[in-house]
Amino acid sequence: MSAPATSLEAPSFERINRGYASVFQANRLSVGLVVPIERYAGGPVPTMARHLERVRRAEELGFSAVWLRDVPFDVPSFGDAGQVFDPFVYLGLLAGRTERIALGVASVVLPLRHPAHVAKAAASADALSDGRLILGVASGDRPEEYPALALPFAERGARFRASFEYIRRMSETRPSFDNAHGRPGRGLDMLPKPVGGKLPLLVTGSSQQDPEWIARHGDGWMIYPRDVATQARVVGAWRDRVQAAGRRPRPAMQPLYVDLLPDPAAPATPMHLGLRLGAEALRAHLESLRAAGLNHVALNLRFNRADIETTLERLACEVLPALHDREME
């Protein structure tokens, strides 16, 4: 299994578009935020208070990306309605109200949407944001949504794969192909085209695919939080599969729920898919994830107990500079 490469030997990632290139750099770790940027630990639905103001403040403070969710229904057993707004509509708003920060979706549930609509909406958001879109894609993990759309949950893996291939082909000029979702041809084309020639598509988890398929086709891999040692093995195996597929390296990223404590020296204690800890422990944890081979961490402040504005300022002052200093070494 591959060991994490040093900064001198790490080959660069493909520069698919401006957002992808700014977020994913070899042997470096960038930090983003999951939207909504607010605490809503007491229930599944956020208030979305000051949502745009906080995204713009995140951009000013130097966070590399914000990540939206695709949650078409509020499913009681799931317990999280995400940012409530449709991700593509929301991307249009953010594209017009921000300038530099990457706009990510983690992740679009491909089997629930026709891929022509996904391709059109995503390419539009990419063009409107001047190449800042990063599109995570997934097969979906909420079974209740499928009967609501008269779709078979058991077939989501095949639908995901066909959708992925359809979206890829739609970046071409006047593509002609046969697909389970349709047979584009007869000279028709889809506009606009993605800014970088294709959409950056990051596969989430397994998405009901075998690991080799993901390595052959994904522009990156979104994985779930694990202990650092396990994560290092998982990322190393991902690198090996990508290399075996004859492709240049592809990045890996993960989310992390964080409750940033007032005491900077407070040690880390585990919580749901994340950590409750002080700034010093968070810096150390992020550095360990960088050493494990991860290239981006999306912080989720849903369970953060401190004031959100204060937390953003503290993260920018007490955590991000250490990562930036590490990049300069």
Residue ranges and their predicted role:
Residues 1-329:
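Active-site-adjacent structural elements that line small-molecule/cofactor binding pockets in enzymes
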